[in-house]
Amino acid sequence: MLVYLAEYLTRFHTGFNVFSYVTFRAILGLLTALVFSLWFGPKLIERLQLLQIGQVVRNDGPESHFSKRGTPTMGGLLILAAIFISVLLWGDLGSRYVWVMLFVLGSFGLIGFIDDYRKVVRKDTKGLIARWKYILQSLAALLIAFFLYATAANPGETQLVVPFFKDVMPQLGAVFIVLAYFTIVGSSNAVNLTDGLDGLAIMPTVMVAAAFALIAYLSGHAQFANYLHIPHLPGSGELVIVCTAIVGAGLGFLWFNTYPAQVFMGDVGSLSLGAALGTIAVLVRQEILLVIMGGVFVMETLSVILQVGSYKLRGQRIFRMAPIHHHYELKGWPEPRVIVRFWIISIFLVLLGLATLKLR
């Protein structure tokens, strides 16, 4: 929004031209989201406490989690508000990338909100029925996938980038829709499964978003893209604003979500942030790279799939409890140890993912 005001003011003073630089607006976007989260966080937590919107803890969960019962949840509203305000202020509202991301965050955030509302307000422990949650996620993801495929302006927008192989970038054609769908829905649910300990999901989300900010910037510049053998995607630089807004909002939320948490993000936060990471990966053509950098999310998801599959096929469980972070809790690891070690794994995987841009 302010891009247009700055463009007008440039007529009177060339100093306003600095707002045309994506990097400058990205920094302002990060700071805006961070400051908003830190400032409004206590107010939201107080409001949630007054409304008695507290976390529901399963009786069959780890005993250490019983103390979390009643902790304010739906804090993802704070994250979404910070991102929306930041992007609307500093993003180029004429960019297709910006509106796609706002739609993703809004639609998946709404699905998560309905789920949380049913759990904590209507006291329905099951929340939104799993079937309906998946249907709504699928509708939103398919709408995004079809839109991106129909509006692709150059061949690079529907290529598949394969890490470590600089000349392997096959054209996907209509298969793009299928890949985009599974990436968005899968990422959304993976982050949701990871969000089981204080700060466990938000920090890897921040790390992956920061990495995608760099990738989006490189993809938007022809020279960098050609040098790294990745698709040149004109205009993708605007995704940097979205990514840094996620980073700022995430760090601000972590201030209150770190152990022992004062607030949880709830499904309204985890489903929307996961879908956002998946959509960014689709937009910059780095779906495989998301699997690497988001390895913690993948590990959590696979642990659930393996646990359920093993129990149904063999009648035996592989882990003491799934997702896998609960397994380590039941082994006696203190919660902060599980969290920090998963963060360390995430740092390693993000750096490995970034290294693949050059190791081709």
UniProtKB/Swiss-Prot annotation:
Q: Per UniProt, which keywords does this protein have?
A: Cell cycle, Cell division, Cell inner membrane, Cell membrane, Cell shape, Cell wall biogenesis/degradation, Magnesium, Membrane, Metal-binding, Peptidoglycan synthesis, Transferase, Transmembrane, Transmembrane helix
Note the InterPro entries from the entry: Glycosyl_transferase_4, PNAcMuramoyl-5peptid_Trfase, PNAcMuramoyl-5peptid_Trfase_CS
> What are the transmembrane regions?
26-46, 74-94, 97-117, 134-154, 168-188, 199-219, 236-256, 263-283, 288-308, 338-358
Annotated EC: 2.7.8.13
Name one molecular function that GO assigns to this entry.
phospho-N-acetylmuramoyl-pentapeptide-transferase activity
The record, for NCBIfam families, names: mraY (TIGR00445)
Q: What does this protein do?
A: Catalyzes the initial step of the lipid cycle reactions in the biosynthesis of the cell wall peptidoglycan: transfers peptidoglycan precursor phospho-MurNAc-pentapeptide from UDP-MurNAc-pentapeptide onto the lipid carrier undecaprenyl phosphate, yielding undecaprenyl-pyrophosphoryl-MurNAc-pentapeptide, known as lipid I.
Task: Please state what the protein is called.
Answer: Phospho-N-acetylmuramoyl-pentapeptide-transferase
Q: Point out the gene that encodes the protein.
A: mraY
